[in-house]
Regions:
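Helical coiled-coil signaling stalks immediately cytosolic to transmembrane anchors
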Residues: 138-139
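Conserved beta-hairpin
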Residues: 50-83
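Short Pro/Gly-enriched beta-strand edge/turn motifs at strand-loop
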Residues: 43-47, 86-89
């Protein structure tokens, strides 16, 4: 079994969350003199942060390769995973839309296409190994837009 996953604290979306938390904390500190305003803003801030964290957690997927299946798992929402048996996979797409998006994986089976799972917990340095391993197992792996990431880590 091979797991393609980086530590939870190193996911790329964390860099987006840090400034938001700092800005909200500064706004909260400005309201300390007024208890009623402080409590109201605290409730609003907690609601906003809860929403942002819940949305960010939908991007936290990593990939597990077992002897006869490919598993895409989300550690934040443990119920949210997909397991694909190797004998049912027709094609795998590991792509990158560019800009502020994150790489994704999509598996095509005879029955249907899977969702595009944003693999923010897969380290960029692991993509060449993941793609090579999948191709060695005989799968067609398409990598639209991923050449930027693959070329960046080619000489490491």
């Amino acid at each position: 079994m091979k797991i393609y996953r980086r530590p939870f604290k190193k996911f790329i979306s964390m860099y987006t969350l840090k400034p938001i938390v700092v800005i909200l904390a500064l706004f909260l500190l400005m309201t300390i003199g007024n208890l009623k305003g402080f409590l109201v803003f605290l409730v609003i801030e907690l609601c906003v942060l809860s929403f942002i964290v819940a949305c960010t957690a939908t991007q936290l997927f990593y990939v597990v390769l077992t002897e006869n299946s490919l598993i895409v798992q989300n550690p934040a929402y443990r119920f949210w995973y997909a397991e694909f048996q190797f004998n049912t996979i027709e094609k795998i797409e590991i792509g990158y839309k560019g800009g502020l998006s994150r790489p994704y994986i999509q598996v095509m089976t005879p029955a249907k296409k899977s969702w595009r799972y944003v693999t923010d917990l897969v380290d960029e340095r692991d993509y060449p190994d993941l793609i090579q391993t999948l191709r060695e197992k005989g799968f067609t792996v398409e990598t639209p837009g991923l050449h930027h990431i693959l070329n960046k880590h080619e000489n490491l």
